Curated annotation (Swiss-Prot):
HAMAP family referenced in this protein's UniProt entry, alphabetically: Ribosomal_uL22_B
NCBIfam families (alphabetical): rplV_bact (TIGR01044)
Keywords, ordered alphabetically: Ribonucleoprotein, Ribosomal protein, RNA-binding, rRNA-binding
UniProt record similarity statement: Belongs to the universal ribosomal protein uL22 family.
Name of this chain's protein: Large ribosomal subunit protein uL22
Gene Ontology BP annotations: translation
Superkingdom of the organism of origin: Bacteria
A GO CC term assigned to this protein in UniProt: cytosolic large ribosomal subunit
Amino acid sequence: MMEVKAIHRGARISAQKTRLVADQIRGLPVDKALNVLTFSPKKAAGIVKKVVLSAIANAEHNEGADIDELKITSIYIDKAASLKRFTARAKGRGNRIEKQSCHITVTVGN
């Protein structure tokens, strides 16, 4: 059984939001998964779609796989480093803002 990975490290979107999209396509054949991602209104769908397309290209180029038989065997989202920022508040105070990022790992196989 062949499995091929594609990883996007440091995607500038929170892991929580990205997992909502990842849960929808886990275990689907790649053509159905791409269809779901194409018509999803979420920002994370576009990012995950690029990683899925990269995994498909890796399978085709490196392993000579047939695209019609591929399915998403695993997809997981890990939390990555946060960018710490401050925003001004009233009376000279400041609040910390964390700009979240995540690592997206997609594995396709047959």
